[in-house]
Swiss-Prot record:
One Pfam family, short name: Ribosomal_L16
Any Gene Ontology biological process: translation
Protein's UniProt keywords contain Secreted: no
Gene that this polypeptide is encoded by: rplP
Oligomer status and interactors: Part of the 50S ribosomal subunit.
Covalent S-S links between cysteines: none
Protein name: Large ribosomal subunit protein uL16
The family this protein is said to belong to: Belongs to the universal ribosomal protein uL16 family.
Role summary: Binds 23S rRNA and is also seen to make contacts with the A and possibly P site tRNAs.
Gene Ontology annotations for the cellular component aspect, listed alphabetically: cytosolic large ribosomal subunit
Keywords: Ribonucleoprotein, Ribosomal protein, RNA-binding, rRNA-binding, tRNA-binding
Species the sequence originates in: Picosynechococcus sp. (strain ATCC 27264 / PCC 7002 / PR-6) (Agmenellum quadruplicatum)
Keyword RNA-binding: yes
Gene Ontology MF terms: rRNA binding; structural constituent of ribosome; tRNA binding
Amino acid sequence: MLSPKRTKFRKQHRGRMRGMAYRGNNIQFGDYALQAVEPSWITARQIEAARRAMTRYIKRGGKIWIRIFPDKPITMRPAETRMGSGKGNPEFWVAVVKPGRIMFEMNGVAEPIAREAMRLAAQKLPIKTKFITRNEEYI
């Protein structure tokens, strides 16, 4: 699963997800892409599940690019712990995804195959997504 090798700080504020993605919202590498329509945190496990779904469907053909990286640590407190005594320990990593963000790109396969592979990947994600092609209009 994806996670940073090292970070400057162990813990981060939760932050807010306002507005559209103004970076990472154009197709850069492939011909087909999966674009987020809603804002959400996407965990490293969800990214890996989506990647597996796509690679298993396209088998040996084509290439996949993952355009999001989980670089935000999410902390959790142990179960049945009283409040106070500081922030919990980092449990997992998430990528902050805003509407318009390209999450996955694909190349080297026919459009129907790419569309089905992206549909399978989208089922693993907790947000609404949109299949787009290189010459298509974005959100």
